[in-house]
C-alpha cells in the first residue's frame, strides 16, 4: 500500500507487525484488514489534513466497505475463522504450515486484497458523514497516552489510527484500544520490514511463534513474546478482545460511534488500562 501511494512510512509499517494472525496470532481481525485499512487512511493523508473530521469519516466509510468486501469474498474477517487453527498450540501451528494449503490460501487472499486496494488509489474522500465537535478515538488515544508517558510514539501513526475505532471501521472486530497498545509496543520492538534480511526474517518468525507456545520467552524481546502478555492482560480486564463483545452493540457510522464513546465510562477505562499495560511492558522490556 505504501509503495503504491509513494508514501513510505516505515515506522507506521513497523507498528503493525504484531497484528499478524489477528493480533499476536489471537485469531481476531485478520492482519490483512488491519494493514489495508491503515493503508487507506495513508492514501488520503492530505485529505485528512485538509478536511479533518469530514475526510476521516469518509475514510472510515471506505475502510468499512473494504472490510465488508473481504468478508464476502473470503467468508470471514477473523483469522480464527479463515484459518481454522489455534496458533497457541503446536498442532495448530503445524496445521497452518503443513501441507501448506492454509498458508497458501492466505497468500492468495493477500494478493486479491492488494488488487482491491490498488483500485481505490486516487479516489476523492473529502466528504463523509457530517459530524461536529472534537472526535474521540480508541487506538489513537492509547498511542497518545503511551507517547506522553514513555516518549515512544509516531505522529503519523496517531493521525491514521482512527481507522481502528469500533473494531476497525465500526465493524466490531479487534478492540481499538488493544490495537493501540500493540502498535505502541511494536514501535519499540517490531520488525523493520524493509531492511530485514531473509535469515533475520525467518529467525524472527520462528522465535515469535515459539514464544506463543512456551512460558519463558526465548531470545531478545520481540513482538509476539511480549504481545501475547498484553493480549492476555487486556482480555483479563475486558473479558474479550473484540469490540462487538465489549460494547455489546453494533455501530451505524461515525456519529453513532462518537455518541457512544462520549458516554461510555467503561470504554474510557479500557483505553486507560490498555495504555497502562503497554507502558508497563515497555518499561519492563526496554530496561
What are these regions (language model features)?
Residues 92-124, 240-287:
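Acidic, carboxylate-rich catalytic segments that either coordinate divalent cations
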Residues 18-28, 98-101, 127-133, 163-173, ...:
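A short glycine/serine-rich beta->alpha loop
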Residues 1-18, 142-162, 244-249:
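Acidic-glycine-rich active-site phosphate/pyrophosphate-binding loop
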Residues 47-92, 193-250:
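A structural-propensity feature for long, helix-poor, extended segments
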Residues 26-38, 168-183:
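Conserved phosphate/anionic-ligand binding catalytic regions in large, soluble enzymes, centered on
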Residues 3-84:
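Ordered, small/hydrophobic-rich secondary-structure cores
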Residues 12, 76-82, 123-131, 154-157, ...:
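Flexible, glycine/charged-enriched surface loops at secondary-structure junctions
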Amino acid at each position: 500500500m505504501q509503495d503504491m501511494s509513494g508514501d513510505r512510512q516505515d515506522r507506521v509499517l513497523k507498528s503493525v507487525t504484531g497484528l499478524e494472525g489477528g493480533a499476536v496470532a489471537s485469531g481476531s481481525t485478520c492482519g490483512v484488514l488491519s494493514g489495508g485499512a491503515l493503508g487507506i487512511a495513508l492514501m488520503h493523508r492530505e485529505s485528512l489534513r485538509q478536511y479533518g473530521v469530514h475526510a476521516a469519516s469518509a475514510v472510515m466509510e471506505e475502510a468499512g466497505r473494504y472490510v465488508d468486501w473481504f468478508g464476502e469474498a473470503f467468508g470471514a474477517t477473523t483469522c480464527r475463522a479463515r484459518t481454522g487453527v489455534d496458533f497457541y498450540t503446536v498442532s495448530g501451528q503445524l496445521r497452518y504450515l503443513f501441507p501448506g494449503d492454509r498458508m497458501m490460501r492466505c497468500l492468495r487472499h493477500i494478493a486479491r486484497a492488494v488488487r482491491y486496494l490498488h483500485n481505490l488509489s486516487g479516489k476523492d474522500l473529502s466528504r463523509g458523514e457530517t459530524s461536529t465537535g472534537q472526535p474521540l478515538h480508541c487506538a489513537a488515544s492509547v498511542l497518545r497516552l503511551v507517547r506522553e508517558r514513555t516518549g515512544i510514539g509516531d505522529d503519523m501513526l496517531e493521525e491514521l489510527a482512527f481507522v481502528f475505532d469500533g473494531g476497525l471501521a465500526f465493524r466490531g472486530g479487534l478492540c481499538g484500544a488493544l490495537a493501540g497498545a500493540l502498535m505502541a509496543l511494536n514501535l519499540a520492538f517490531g520488525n523493520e520490514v524493509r531492511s530485514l534480511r531473509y535469515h533475520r526474517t525467518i529467525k524472527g518468525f520462528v522465535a515469535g511463534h515459539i514464544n506463543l507456545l512456551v512460558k519463558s520467552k526465548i531470545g531478545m524481546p520481540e513482538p509476539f513474546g511480549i504481545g501475547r502478555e498484553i493480549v492476555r492482560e487486556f482480555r483479563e480486564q475486558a473479558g474479550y478482545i473484540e469490540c462487538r463483545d465489549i460494547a455489546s452493540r453494533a455501530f451505524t457510522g461515525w456519529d453513532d460511534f462518537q455518541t457512544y464513546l462520549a458516554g461510555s465510562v467503561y470504554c474510557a477505562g479500557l483505553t486507560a488500562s490498555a495504555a497502562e499495560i503497554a507502558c508497563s511492558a515497555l518499561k519492563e522490556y526496554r530496561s
